[in-house]
Amino acid sequence: MKITLIQPSVGKINNKPYIKSWTMEPLALSTLAGLTPDDIEIEFIDERIDELPESYETDLVGITVETYTAKRAYNIANKIRNQGVPVVMGGIHANLVPDEVSKHCDAMLVGGAEGGIWNKILDDFRNHSLSKKYDSNAYFNPILEHVNPRRDLYRNKGYLPLGLVESGRGCPFTCEFCAITSAHKAKYRAKQIDKIVEDIGNIPQKMLYFADDNFVSKFSRTQELCDAIAPLKKKWFSHGTINMANDRKLLKKLQKSGCSNLLIGFESLNEHTLKKMGKSWAIVKRGYSESLKILRDHGIAVYGTFVFGYDEDSVDDIKKSLDFAINEKMCLAAFNHLVPYPGTALYSRFLKEGRLIDKEWWLKDGYNFGDVSFSPKNFTPEELSKSCYDARMQFYSFSNIIKRTEFMANCKDPFLNPFQTFAFMSANIISQKGIKQRQSWPIGNIIDNYGKILE
């Protein structure tokens, strides 16, 4: 028996290379491959890098689906099914809009593939009794089963030089706009620490990315994990929260374990907007500056993210956030417009208020990366998109990269630790290039250099 696993692209421009910053290792599919019995042959195709075949010589195809890849995934699946090959779909988009996903596949997995459900799907397929829907969320287990990913599938693909690892999944917070909250029902599941250490031991890269939704969901458990991975002498980064700065013991352990950078979602500098988002827990009474200094003092650089489009947001708020990120010497930053992901509380609110430009914006012909899919209060959709793009470009201008050079966290000592300085400069240059490439990148289609849809 042979299975083909496909990672769809967001979309492509014919004869143009795919965006480098979007080519991390696809951990979900290598994990799925790790769950697959040894007697099944696995073919792995990453459309971001590989060309899709015209015909599929395989027994079963598995496709992972995110909101931004959904349209492309459906096009691929429809072509494969027309050849008589059955398709199984899963991924976060299947959690958010299962009824939509189920229209484009023979079987759909809602929730994670661990816990025996993937083997159940394979057994049912072999016995010609495949069900339309499988739901692992019905059997919630706070312990997330560890699987050794098939990292051999990454060979010769040219991914970013980062080793991806997962220590937990989900997030306990309930932010209005967050698809993770909706997909995992604000629940967090952690893997066993000894299994994580074992997995890291199999990763050749010196820099790791913990692809957790929130690496510090439970401070006590994070400290235990840091103690366990410190002897491995790896550098790593992940997602955190600003309230980490309240726990000096945690920060020391993060630093000792090799943490060099954390992505922190500030989202807004306006307390009222944070409350509207459901992020009142992120309000820091002493101010962000002191907390950021504490993080820098522990050698932790910050990748700050901000989101705009709430009703009190204005051009001035974007400017204040940009100045704040530059003055605080953030290693990296993102200035994004609000995205009403399906299945989220934000999507439901905008739908009720009649503010969605298109109810299924992710499937709309002509939708491009950077397009705003709702009607903001203080901007036109085009103004909001351009304001966010301009802020990104200003943050990553050469003069502002130099301004953000900082030797406690971003670069350390450039003579004693040239790797950190090189990493800082490289990440900023790649980000600058990626911003230009991403803006107006086609979502869901392959287009030619003149914008004509090829497929």
What are these regions (language model features)?
Residues 44-46, 89, 238, 304, ...:
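A structural preference for short, hydrophobic beta-strand core positions in alpha/beta folds
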Residues 29, 73, 118, 193-196, ...:
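Aromatic/hydrophobic pocket-lining residues that form the small-molecule binding cavity
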Residues 8-14, 100, 220, 272-278, ...:
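Flexible glycine/acidic-rich beta-alpha junction loops that bind and position SAM and/or redox cofactors
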